[in-house]
Amino acid sequence: MAEQSDKAVKYYTLEEIKKHNHSKSTWLILHHKVYDLTKFLEDHPGGEEVLREQAGGDATENFEDIGHSTDARELSKTFIIGELHPDDRSKIAKPVETLITTVDSNSSWWTNWVIPAISAVVVALMYRIYTAED
């Protein structure tokens, strides 16, 4: 069950949150905070199904990708019921940006320069051949 600290913050484990993935109990995680959006499902401008797809898990990346307004961010605070337990925070997948940065920093120079250069030369030659036939 949920643990409580001295500051009266309720901590929920990922296992607990995963159980709340249906229309009668819809919880999700945004920036390590746990939200109960059950009563907001019908009022969500993007539709109920958008929230239900994210229910029981971390919706931080999708929330940020949509570009919610300041009003939406303020409204979301009213649905906070606690925080993700500190032990479970490392279990949440890294954002895609982090993964892309890691892949880009490990790729070699030829994938960034040689392949595009060769592709450009091939396209230029094909264009020259095509225009020379006319």
From Swiss-Prot:
Family to which this protein belongs: Belongs to the cytochrome b5 family.
InterPro entries: Cyt_B5-like_heme/steroid-bd (IPR001199), Cyt_B5-like_heme/steroid_sf (IPR036400), Cyt_B5_heme-BS (IPR018506), Cytochrome_b5 (IPR050668)
Domain Cytochrome b5 heme-binding: 9-85
N-acetylalanine modification, residue list: A2
Descriptive protein name: Cytochrome b5
Membrane-spanning ranges: 109-131
Subcellular locations according to the entry: Endoplasmic reticulum membrane; Microsome membrane
Keywords: Acetylation, Electron transport, Endoplasmic reticulum, Heme, Iron, Membrane, Metal-binding, Microsome, Transmembrane, Transmembrane helix, Transport
Pfam families documented for this protein: Cyt-b5 (PF00173)
Any one GO cellular component localisation term in the record: endoplasmic reticulum membrane
Sites of N6-acetyllysine modification: K7, K10, K19
Topology with respect to the bilayer: Single-pass membrane protein
Keyword Nuclease annotated: no
Keyword Ribonucleoprotein: no
GO molecular function, one term: metal ion binding
Binding, heme: H44, H68
Source organism of the structure: Equus caballus (Horse)
